């Protein structure tokens, strides 16, 4: 009788499942009730048959199949080995690991005719060969794998897996006949039996020959058979072992190969129809073991000794098992096996998932470590690269610094060399200047006497020339003679004779035909004579340089230039003549003279820019100055004075000396700026001229007459010098008295005032007595003659009087204009002069600016000017009229005197006088009139190297 074990069947599988019960939370608690009495077995056999069963068991001990006992021992040994490996002895609810190890004794009496019936086959025919068995065995494994994939997780995976692995027992692959097999599992089974306390002996077992002859079972086929829970499995397929009740046939029946449970199974009716009796299918010995092991309370079977050979009994008592019972047991086994397979599949799946997770964790951990390691390597690599780059940058920086230091040293050395060279040049230049200065000082002894300036010759006007109007004859112009031939007295007397002795014999027509016209040379005007009279030195032109060609010989200079060419134009001579290019054919080509195929513009190459001459510009200037000095010869520049040269007691003031030096230097610079070159003056040597040879040496006489000795008149007595000085002072007083009305309050410049005053004097519009003497005590020692009154004062005298007696400044009363000093106005009794002045102009004067027109009071028609002159002068006003700077009292300068227009013309020296004026302080200027005349500064007048006393006009 087969039944499903709730907690675990005894045997190999029961041992595995019993140890797993404690770890399975899914199983109910009621299934553990049977474990409380481990040694009590339930006897499912009726009491009436107990004796029979004991007898049957006693008889079946000798008739047991050796192969089944070996398989069971192997199963138990495998279970013990697996349990020892997988479990530890623990007590749960008083139940130990040996409680579920129930010894299963299968007491079956297998007769000579033993038949193994596979309930899954369609017929009970015996297979002819072993091929079907191997095929079914191979088909069982995929079905098992398919079932394992669908199991559920209901318990401990490890314990169940070990139990399933221990269920595999070694069974013959071909038949169940008693074949002598000697395997390693027997030793294991012996060991397992010893552990359970069984007294089985490990000895080789002999299987009786059920087939044609004895065969050795291979190890692989033995492993395919197993027993679990009293059910015999081949692989994973349960097998049922039947015995023939009749025992008629000889025991030469081959075992049928088993097929998996998963395949198509035939109904049990078809299986049982092959036997003579339907009710007697299984023997009592084949089912005694399952029935006895199904009850945990039944007593364990005593251990038995197995011999190597066991003869089959001729007759074995059998027990009837119904088909319904067999079918139920089979279904239960199938369900249990399916559940075990599902559970095992789930456990395997969970284990695979766990292993996969662990594998993934390991891989993630390994990947993380690799990433960390890689990151560290990258970090180290970057640090190494950064360190190498920093070292490289430091090396480059050090190299650059070294190169920079070397370049700096080179520049410093070059600069020092240049400075040394410049210092040497300056030293050489200083030595040359010193030599020149020494030469110039020595040359002062041999200096030529300079001729004083002569007044310009008056303009000469040609007389009436018929229909031509009179015209001016300039210095370089000469009137042509009216008669080319010279008039001789002989020719004149001959003409008179011919006129007196006229006769008709001579024909005038014949005379005209045969007479030859007279010839005369060109009218030549000698320019040398004019130069000789104007200068005491004859200027001799130096010969032309060797490199200058003669124009007459080489012809005119020509310019060949084209706008589309980059090549510079040609400037020079072109003397080649051609016979092909003419005026009528200007575009003809002369291939003999010119090559028209060559483009000279393409061959032109621009010159590379030269080196910088910033350091040598001063040298060039020095060279130019040296050249000019060489051209000047032994003459020193204008204004150059040696030590103590030209210094007199009157000129001892260093400030005035500096001012004069600056003025002369400025004049010299302006003269050089005009681009005038100097010519070397060479002396002309003229020998003695005798009185007899005057006609021959007429030109030389004219030159020498300029230096002829003349007798000077005897100088007057010393007393006569004082009236002469007084005369000049009186003339200045007279001019100043007439100038005051025009000067005081005038907004125009000194040039306009001087020109207007001279024009008035030229027209005779000024009265002789417009002013009074400076003081009552002053008396005229000499009455001016009409010629003196009619004489026009010079510009220099008028300018001197204006600068001495007035100042050009801005005062609260009026804007910038000329203000005469109060003491001067008081001395001439003209304090009432208006500001601005009321003067009737006879010349055109510039109009006043618009911004100041409002502050200027009306001056009547005398101050008005034409509108055209106003418009014309408004656009050319000087910027100095907008200057609002207040001058200090007593400060007189050239700019203050000139007003709107600066006087840049040179002052003409009148009568060779040179006056040095000492300007008093402001306190002296504002002194009373009486004190002013006595405290006036001294004025030195150099007239023929004579020093005169000061006059009251000297004080300002």
Curated annotation (Swiss-Prot):
Region Necessary for homodimerization and competence for chromatin assembly: start-end pairs: 642-678
Xref: InterPro entries: CAF-1_p150_acidic (IPR021644), CAF1-p150_C2 (IPR029105), CAF1_p150_N (IPR029091), CAF1A_DD (IPR022043)
UniProt-annotated stretches for the region Binds to PCNA: 1-49
Biased composition (Basic and acidic residues): 329-432
Cross-link Glycyl lysine isopeptide (Lys-Gly) (interchain with G-Cter in SUMO2) per UniProt, renumbered positions: 182
Region (Binds to p60): 660-956
Pfam families (UniProt xref): CAF1-p150_C2, CAF1-p150_N, CAF1A_acidic, CAF1A_dimeriz
Region (Disordered): 45-65, 122-155, 188-222, 250-432, 599-639, 765-790, 844-873, 933-956
Compartments (UniProt record): Nucleus
Protein keywords: Cell cycle, Chaperone, Chromatin regulator, DNA damage, DNA repair, DNA replication, Isopeptide bond, Nucleus, Phosphoprotein, Ubl conjugation
Its biological purpose: Acts as a component of the histone chaperone complex chromatin assembly factor 1 (CAF-1), which assembles histone octamers onto DNA during replication and repair. CAF-1 performs the first step of the nucleosome assembly process, bringing newly synthesized histones H3 and H4 to replicating DNA; histones H2A/H2B can bind to this chromatin precursor subsequent to DNA replication to complete the histone octamer. It may play a role in heterochromatin maintenance in proliferating cells by bringing newly synthesized cbx proteins to heterochromatic DNA replication foci.
Family in the record: Belongs to the CHAF1A family.
Protein name: Chromatin assembly factor 1 subunit A
